[in-house]
Amino acid sequence: MFPANEVLQEKWRPDAYVLEAPFNKMVDEVESFALAKPFKCLINIQTIIENIDLAFDNETLIKNIKEPIFIMHAEDDGIIPFRLGKRLFDVAETNSCNARFFPFEKCLHLGHDNIYSADQFQEVVQVIINICR
């Protein structure tokens, strides 16, 4: 959602935000990455991320969005865990009455990159279009 941070600084605002497989915070994403787990006891990942200015704190950014927010996430996403997208939605829902979450079931085998190929994808897009009209 980093480009959204730039959009939030502009006077022009989009009609809605559509997020596909987002994460809530970079620190949570890094800590959920399998190769990072052995290092958790050796280093403070959060401090390192903050020191190199890579916090990508989407939870904070999303609190400033008043437009509708639509989040899509596949349950079998192996890159960004589903629970991180859901956690971001929970924050959005608390701050915006227009937040919607569209989960895609694990049995569809969509992973991180293939939500667009799901049969229900067109239905989700139509819902978004109808809400934004």
Tell me what each language-model feature is.
Residues 2, 80-81:
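Extracytoplasmic/secreted cell-surface and envelope-processing proteins
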Residues 2-61, 67, 114-117:
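Hydrolase active-site cap/lid region
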Residues 18, 70-72, 102:
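Hydrophobic/aromatic beta-strand patches that form the interior of the parallel beta-sheet core
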Residues 24, 52, 76-77, 108-110:
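Conserved beta-strand elements of beta-rich interaction domains across eukaryotes
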Residues 64-66, 70-73, 77:
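Short beta-strand/loop motif that positions the catalytic acidic residue
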Residues 82-89, 94-133:
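C-terminal catalytic histidine-bearing segment of alpha/beta-hydrolase fold enzymes
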